[in-house]
């Protein structure tokens, strides 16, 4: 049979020869993925990646609309019987150890990091590897609980039989940059120090690539915690350090200098240089600010959906990397309300959003000229 998930939060099974719904799967060949989710506003939850068949169950995550509010649908990961469509387990980080459907009147934990990208499975080890995003919304985290931060922007190995966590590795601490782990984890066997190791390679939006033992989650190349710039937003916090994959090549790009900026006319080049000096920018991981922050790599990467390719025979890793800086401006709630009341939609939020339930909205857009061209010299990827 062929099983697929949809953008209206269903999973459908059809006969691979006839295309007819499999009548023994759910109700006439389909199940709803909204069970246990509670209130789901239109377009706030759907599936963007196919289910993964892992040790006899179908594992599926879901996409949650970015940057709307704190109380968005859960980022729960679920597994289903591929023949009947019955729930096998649910990995809900707010109910660790409880893999069942929530009781009547309750829901999976709302606002938790979701898994919108592709997952990967090792049937021999009985593990499914899920790349996580961060708790909603993306650019402010003062409200986040310890458990929301624990599994955010991480690679998590889940026991495919039980739905329990075996290990996890975090690529960004207290992520306030939308640095989700965006790519399918790549599972390969690599010879290291004369021994064949089972490896999972984790590409990131940050341009850092982490190589981990896929049995234990232990880094197989050096990872260093380095100091990073700190937030100046009230009621926010930021991690004093962030993990850098110093034992692997980094594609996080050099720090941008003024001479790296371009324009097709003197006018837009001057506009780019003026904006560059007005934005807060202290290199990688500069936190969002009311002043406006230059973020490079931006929330599109670095690396994104495409993951990496591996030539196992020659032990070569091939990547596709993006070179585009973005700018993030945090808008105090009172100012955002005034803008909305005045119906000032001249710029909107870009790919940011109102972030209701926090003190700030966020406007996030490409660091570009008034002619909508990148301010940074090419190449762009």
Report each predicted region and the residues it spans.
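A fold-level detector for beta-propeller and closely related beta-sheet-rich head/sensor domains
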Residues: 1-10, 15-381
């Amino acid at each position: 049979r062929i099983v697929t998930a949809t953008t209206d939060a269903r999973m459908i099974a059809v006969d691979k020869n006839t295309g007819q719904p499999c009548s023994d799967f759910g109700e006439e060949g389909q199940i709803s993925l909204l069970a246990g989710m509670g209130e789901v506003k239109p377009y706030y939850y759907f599936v963007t990646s196919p289910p993964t068949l892992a040790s006899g169950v179908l594992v599926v995550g879901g996409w949650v609309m970015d940057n709307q509010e704190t109380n968005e649908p859960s980022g729960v990961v679920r597994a289903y019987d591929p023949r009947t469509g019955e729930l096998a387990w649910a990995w809900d980080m707010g109910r660790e150890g409880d893999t069942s459907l929530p009781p009547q009147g309750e829901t999976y934990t709302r606002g938790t990091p979701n898994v919108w990208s592709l997952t990967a499975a090792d049937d021999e080890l009985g593990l499914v590897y899920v790349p996580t995003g961060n708790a909603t919304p993306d650019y402010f985290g003062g409200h986040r609980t310890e458990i929301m931060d624990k599994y955010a922007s991480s690679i998590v190995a889940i026991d495919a039989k039980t739905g329990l966590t075996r290990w996890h590795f975090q690529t960004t601490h207290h992520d306030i940059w939308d640095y989700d782990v965006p790519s399918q984890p790549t599972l390969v066997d690599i010879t290291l120090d004369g021994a064949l190791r089972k490896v999972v390679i984790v590409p990131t939006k940050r341009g850092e690539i982490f190589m981990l033992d896929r049995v234990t989650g232990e880094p197989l190349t050096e990872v260093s915690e380095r100091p990073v710039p700190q937030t100046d937003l009230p009621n926010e916090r930021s991690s004093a350090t962030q993990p850098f994959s110093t034992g692997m090549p980094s594609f996080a790009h050099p720090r941008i200098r003024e001479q790296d900026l371009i324009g097709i006319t003197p006018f837009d080049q001057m506009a780019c240089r003026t904006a560059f000096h007005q934005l807060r920018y202290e290199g990688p991981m500069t936190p969002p600010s009311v002043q406006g922050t230059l973020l490079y790599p931006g929330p599109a990467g670095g690396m994104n959906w495409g993951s990496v390719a591996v030539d196992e025979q020659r032990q070569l890793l091939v990547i596709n990397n993006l070179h585009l800086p973005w700018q993030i401006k945090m808008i105090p709630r009172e100012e955002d309300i005034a803008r909305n009341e005045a119906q000032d939609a001249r710029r909107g939020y870009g790919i940011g959003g109102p972030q209701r339930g926090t003190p700030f909205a966020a406007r996030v857009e490409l660091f570009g000229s008034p002619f909508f061209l990148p301010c940074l010299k090419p190449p762009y990827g």
